[in-house]
């Protein structure tokens, strides 16, 4: 991944993520942290959401990241494709540490930490 894209992803904190089930797309927005090693996008999701149900079966995602304050004349953004990972306790601990260090208030909100491995951005 190019350094300019890594820097852009690292500077921002909201992503729009899309998943799909039976050719029906579904999108959601989330706060994220980024782990450069492995190109991992970490987010937290409430339990029993529609996107969590879809991602249980279909791990492929796509999404966008744009600045929180968009200037129409100079809009920039990153589009990505990736896959949801379920790689055990070590990844879960690393992802949780990354996410909660960026969003400590999220510790009191019920939900599940999820990890997207970016395959293209």
Give residue spans per PLM region.
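Charged, gly/pro-rich active-site loop segments
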Residues: 76-121
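Short beta-turn/strand-loop junction motif enriched in small, turn-promoting residues
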Residues: 14, 68-70, 121
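Helix-adjacent hinge/juxtasegments
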Residues: 51-85
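Short glycine/serine/proline-enriched coil/turn segments at secondary-structure junctions
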Residues: 22-25, 71-73, 106-107
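Extreme N-terminal tail/first-helix region
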Residues: 1-15
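Short acidic (Asp/Glu) patches
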Residues: 45-49, 62-67, 92-103
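A generic structural signal for nonpolar/aromatic side chains embedded in well-ordered alpha-helices
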Residues: 9, 54-55, 99
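Short beta-strand segments
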Residues: 12-47, 55, 63-65
